[in-house]
Swiss-Prot record:
Domain PPIase FKBP-type: 160-245
Any one of the GO CC terms: cytoplasm
Role of this protein: Involved in protein export. Acts as a chaperone by maintaining the newly synthesized protein in an open conformation. Functions as a peptidyl-prolyl cis-trans isomerase.
Family under the similarity heading: Belongs to the FKBP-type PPIase family. Tig subfamily.
Primary localisation category: cytoplasm
Gene Ontology biological-process entries: 'de novo' cotranslational protein folding; cell division; chaperone-mediated protein folding; protein transport; protein unfolding
Organism: Dehalococcoides mccartyi (strain ATCC BAA-2266 / KCTC 15142 / 195) (Dehalococcoides ethenogenes (strain 195))
Chaperone listed as a keyword: yes
Isomerase is among the record's keywords: yes
Annotated catalysed reactions: [protein]-peptidylproline (omega=180) = [protein]-peptidylproline (omega=0)
Protein name listed in UniProt: Trigger factor
């Protein structure tokens, strides 16, 4: 085996390896012993077919394809181990070049490299947000809608109504959506079963069917719907309208027995909103700091780190989407418009930012020795379990499990690192230092 080509660019090494005929022959023998036990050949018992007959039956090209799994991963690892310059960060990606001669290539991710900028010069301002009466009114309005009841309405359909209806439809003449008693919330932003469907329902009355058509846009995310015409026939069976509760002291007390007046409810909302706004302002402040740290630093990392982070982000987004859309049909319709390629393109910048942020802050933590001591970790476990009562020792044992304790160390490290750089960023702005003139330098020399 010999490495015929090697390149190291950034955090990736690329090698091309040609294997000796003897190595390939040994691999073919191994492959034969593996396959002969599985493949039945007429005239021979399974596992007893002579090798020459077996290879002729299977074909040399097929045998060489099969031998890849038997010898290439091990050969690739050996080539990496023999090269002192290559320190793999993750598993290599291997591709065959040719089978005769037997040549493969591999791309090997290398560890990330971080060179921090002058982070002690970072400065940022923390935003202060005041809660207004209008902000409180908005929250109360949301609470009223959450506590609303739905009452039968004897009038035409309006936006915001909840309907029970019969739907018959075709898509370019083929059956599309057909439901006998479909519940439907009339909302302008709804895209199911077709964009603008809810607007066609406005002013309809119970028992009077209506027929209408909707043309899906040519650039619709679902290729099977793009440009096609959906013909609907809808019959409203029941209309329900939202009835909001009366806003008074009794409503506040019913919402929470701690409140005797509406004013007390409003004060609690103000406090909660202020706390959330302060948290958001802190998060925005820290985002600015981290962005500045990334921008002033030199950070290089292997692509596999972004790919892993991107997969996690997409999985989280899909779970969040599923939790917010209650209707299975609407979830499937929404999901069908989110192609994997589109989602990867949309969330890739976020994945790249998270990787860079993690690497920069991690480097800062080691540079400034911000890794928590055992005593600090123990103190945090004590704080987390102080209200556990009889289960305190059980919970302490849980936090002291290696995996859980490691996660706690990561959390405390991140907390200490952000606190460290927060303190730097809140310091007064640095004053620019004026360069000394030649005349000034001469005067200083004369005074010496």
């Amino acid at each position: 085996m010999k490495v015929t080509d090697k390149k190291i660019e950034g955090c990736q090494a690329s090698i091309t390896v040609e294997m000796d005929p003897a190595e390939v022959e040994a691999g073919l023998s191994k492959t034969y012993r593996r396959l002969v036990k599985k493949v039945e050949i007429p005239g021979f018992r399974k596992g007893k077919t002579p090798r020459d007959v077996f290879e002729k039956y299977l074909g040399r090209e097929k045998m060489l394809d099969e031998v890849v799994d038997d010898i290439v991963p091990e050969a690739c690892q050996q080539a990496i181990n023999d090269d002192e310059e290559i320190k793999p960060f993750a598993a290599p990606k291997i591709a065959m070049v040719t089978t005769e001669p037997f040549v493969f290539s591999a791309r090997i991710p290398l560890p990330p490299v971080v060179e921090l900028g002058d982070y002690k010069t970072i400065r940022a301002a923390k935003e202060k947000v005041e809660i207004t009466e209008e902000n409180i009114d908005t929250v109360i309005d949301q609470v009223l809608h959450q506590r609303a009841t739905w009452e039968k309405a004897e009038r035409p359909v309006k936006m915001g109504d909840m309907l029970l209806m019969k739907v018959e439809s075709t898509l370019n003449g083929e059956p599309y959506l057909n439901r006998e008693d479909m519940q439907y919330s009339v909302r302008e932003e709804a895209i199911y079963p077709a964009p603008g469907f809810g607007e066609h329902l406005v002013d309809m009355v119970v028992g009077e069917p209506k027929e209408f058509s909707i043309v899906f846009p040519e650039d619709h995310a679902r290729a099977e719907l793009a440009g096609k015409t959906a013909a609907f026939k809808v019959t409203i069976q029941e209309i329900r309208e939202e009835k909001l509760p009366e806003l008074n002291d009794a409503f506040a007390h019913e919402l929470n027995p701690e409140f005797n007046t509406l004013a007390e409810l409003r004060q609690r909302i103000r406090e909660n909103m202020q706390e959330r706004q302060d948290d958001q302002a802190q998060a925005k402040f820290e985002d600015q700091i981290v962005e500045a740290l990334i921008k002033m630093s030199k950070i290089d990392y292997p692509e596999v780190m972004v790919e892993t982070e991107l997969d996690q982000i997409i999985e989280q987004q899909l779970q969040r989407l599923q939790s917010t859309i209650k209707s299975p049909e609407e979830f499937r319709a929404t999901l069908s418009q989110l192609s994997p390629a589109d989602m990867q393109q949309r969330y890739r910048p976020l994945a790249e930012q998270r990787v860079a942020s993690s690497l920069a802050l991690g480097k800062l933590a080691t540079t400034e020795n911000l890794i928590p001591s055992d005593e600090e970790v123990d103190a945090e476990i004590e704080r987390l379990t102080q209200d556990s009562g009889d289960k305190k020792e059980e919970e302490k044992a849980f936090y002291n499990k290696p995996d859980t304790r490691d996660r706690l160390i990561q959390l405390l490290t991140a907390r200490k690192t952000m606190a460290f750089i927060d303190e730097i960023a809140l310091q007064p702005a640095l004053e620019a230092v004026e360069p000394k003139s030649d005349e000034g330098e001469k005067t200083e020399e004369a005074d010496k």
